[in-house]
Amino acid sequence: MSKHSHFRDKKMFQKKAEQFKKFQERISVQFQNEKLLYQAFTHSSYVNEHRKKPYEDNERLEFLGDAVLELTISQFLYAKYPAMSEGDLTKLRAAIVCEPSLVSLAHELSFGELVLLGKGEEMTGGRKRPALLADVFEAFIGALYLDQGLEAVVTFLKAYVFPKIDDGAFSHVMDFKSQLQEFVQRDGRGILEYKILQEKGPAHNREFEANVSLKGEVLGVGSGRSKKEAEQHAAQEALAKLQKHHMKQ
């Protein structure tokens, strides 16, 4: 099937082709088989309204993309957090690939503008529907995998997803104090000590600063709206420092 045959008419083809061209330039990805790219953004409602045309919706690509996304995220987390338990790795991965996270990524990359929808779905606001956008993101990952392989998917995720993990966007599901404790105990390094360094701000907007030390050496410092949050951030910094040192050995 040609690229042109995926659209209703020549005018629509030219408009969409230009949109997809700019999209690929923006994300620094060039599909070898653009039919896969178009399919990733084709909703079943569009196919149902054009049964006489050989259109394919994105549902099979979504199925594949879901598995590819879980694999690549799992590989990244396994390498990045050597002290994290299987249970915590699973929770973190779930937070990264859950619908709200994928919708946020889809919005960030303007996926909604490219989706091909049936008239009925369009009229009922389907273009902004969270589940639809999450599905399109997974379908895009599946299409990229088929077009260029796992390495291309990892390169894309390095640009748009992995930095968010590094920046702590999903830290709300992570218990850094427990991870740090496990890391230290595993190597028999000693006992961790947490200390609240200061409290500042009015009672309704208090901020705490804490550090964590091992055998007198400060490993991390953190701040937060509660003592617990400050200690978690201190543990996060300490864990990152110890893991970086561990990986260099």
UniProtKB/Swiss-Prot annotation:
Xref: SUPFAM superfamilies: dsRNA-binding domain-like (SSF54768), RNase III domain-like (SSF69065)
Active-site feature positions: 66, 138
Cofactor: Mg(2+)
Gene Ontology MF: a single term: rRNA binding
Biological process terms in GO annotation: mRNA processing; regulation of gene expression; rRNA processing; tRNA processing
Region (Disordered) residue spans: 225-249
RNase III domain ranges (all copies): 20-149
Keyword entries, A-Z: Cytoplasm, Endonuclease, Hydrolase, Magnesium, Metal-binding, mRNA processing, Nuclease, RNA-binding, rRNA processing, rRNA-binding, tRNA processing
One Pfam family this sequence matches: Ribonucleas_3_3
Chain sites annotated for binding Mg(2+): 62, 135, 138
The keyword Nuclease appears for this protein: yes
Subunit structure: Homodimer.
Family: Belongs to the ribonuclease III family.
Record's function text: Digests double-stranded RNA. Involved in the processing of primary rRNA transcript to yield the immediate precursors to the large and small rRNAs (23S and 16S). Processes some mRNAs, and tRNAs when they are encoded in the rRNA operon. Processes pre-crRNA and tracrRNA of type II CRISPR loci if present in the organism.
Name of the protein described by the UniProt record: Ribonuclease 3
Organism: Bacillus licheniformis (strain ATCC 14580 / DSM 13 / JCM 2505 / CCUG 7422 / NBRC 12200 / NCIMB 9375 / NCTC 10341 / NRRL NRS-1264 / Gibson 46)
